[in-house]
């Protein structure tokens, strides 16, 4: 059962840049500005953790496991370091599969269940972020 959920999108608050018109053809490739995206995620993940914990009236110590979107191992490690989360309380599989996009959190939860690390009564805080500069989090308690 989900006990708390938090989502936010900055899409509407950001100016639209580089809009192409009839006289300027659209680029043929999609690309990402890696450094600004990394900086965004490094700020968004801790902010989301804080918001979920505040709304759930819980502390870091009350969470059994943390599951982060598997976009970048450094982002995961920085969030864990900021909150002093020990390695046994969070999991990375990006080194095995790469960035699996929207499937990353469910894949991690499935692996954790198979490994016996989460199960009935486990409280898991999940945080995801992605396209459109959006992020969200939830505190899930397994029944």
PLM regions and their residue ranges:
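Short, exposed "boundary/linker" segments that immediately precede the start
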Residues: 1-7
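Claisen-condensing/thiolase-fold acyl-transfer catalytic domains that form or cleave C-C bonds
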Residues: 42, 53, 64-143
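Hydrophobic pocket-lining "lid/loop/helix" segments that shape and contact the acyl-thioester
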Residues: 8-94
